[in-house]
Amino acid sequence: MQFGFNLPISGALAAPDIVARIAGEGEALGYDYLTVTDHLVLPDAAEPGYPYSETGAFFSADAFYRHEQLTIAAWLAAVTSRLRLVLAVMVVPHRPAVLAAKMLATIDVLSGGRLTVGIGAGWLKAEFDAVVTTPFAERGAVTDDYIAAFRALWGTDKPVIDTRYVRYDRLVLEPKPVQNPLPIWVGGESGPSLRRAARFGDAWYPIGSNNQHLLDTLPRYKAGLARLRQLTAAAGRTPDAVAPTYRVKRYGAALSPQPSDGERRLFSGNDTDIVGDIHALEDLGVTAIDFDFERPTEAAVIAEMRSFRERVLAKV
């Protein structure tokens, strides 16, 4: 089992020196990977219905200060030496396919093969309207075409591709990524996301707290995983070809223990409960879990990273 942490790249903690210190602390503490999120621009007024919070609230005023995901990942390749760099997740339609493939390959080379490409189709229409030339309603199909283009450019010399959204003929992309294949973790919890993971993913990378597709209890996660394995087999792959992972936005006392299905919510309760949840997910084959140590100050983030490592992860 690998354990990661979300690195703040927006708001008050996004100053470069703070980001570097938090990343360095995570590396020194023995975490396996860090994650960075992706938004290019944000609307002045948030659209309602953010799926990963109970209230639908998405961002605060200081979230407008936000580093571009791939740029910060390249910078982190230079300020870390061991941590894997996980994109959590890259909104695939936001960047042209060939440009994104080149940038991702470059980051993998600069990091010595430490990049993991978490991907998603996106959800914020106002952001799409500002930066994407393809229609918001077609984002799933665009994402699938772009992923296929990434794979071809990374793994084939002079590939040819002719799809609805990507066309090129015998392009040469060098250098190739260090990793072959460059791992793709498919985010999302919906039916289309599961089908995408089944077709393209090296791992499935869901957040448990999506209010529209909850995976916040052990039975719910088991059902999602069973569905993924059915879809993976239907896609012509071995059922367990896609490694399951899990993203934790809140935990412990910050999380209500009783969801709508009457079961105990994963990662609610005390430290012993959280250790038990990690073991339960490990028994299902989960290979990686990351936690969001969101706190108002750098000192508080680092203190929780240290404390959580001692209280919980050291007992797994």
What are the roles of these predicted feature ranges?
Residues 1-316:
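Active-site-adjacent structural elements that line small-molecule/cofactor binding pockets in enzymes
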